[in-house]
Amino acid sequence: MKNLVAQKWIDECGTLFPIDGNTVLYPTPGSGIFELYQGKGQDKRIGLKKLSEKFEFNHKIYDVGCDNLFDIIQKTWESDKFVEENKNLGVIFTGYKGTGKSVGAKLLCNRLDIPVIIIPDNEIEGMVSFIQQLDFECIV
């Protein structure tokens, strides 16, 4: 006989929804690379689909002296002022096409070891609201 796991129910604003009994609840998605995902069902629920643990490169990455800059960014992010005052930190990469902006951003993401959320090309209804309601440190 098949092992049956009791169905669980979640309460969302007074409405109960059934979920699989094997469902595990986490306070955050944890570190990794995620893509914003919208379910195909009737409710079109938005979630995060894990793509990988870290950004991986299938080509050699040369040392171009970014470690000092990454150190400054990481020290700023982890500083008492940012932690105590719950501040945000924006980093803008600029340069011509092919100069390594995307690679640099991915290397920084790997180093900070916090969730990275990739926004897909297709439009997701309710995406802005979903992102605004995230209550954990992440890179979008």
Task: Name each region found by the language model.
Residues M1-S79, F93-G98, L108, L134-D135:
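AAA+ P-loop ATPase mechanoenzymes
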Residues W77-N88:
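Phosphate-binding P-loop
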Residues D121-M127:
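Short acidic loop-to-helix transition motifs that present clustered carboxylates
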Residues V128-V140:
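Conserved nucleotide-sensing/catalytic segment adjacent to the nucleotide-binding pocket
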Residues K87-I119, F130-Q132:
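Walker A/P-loop
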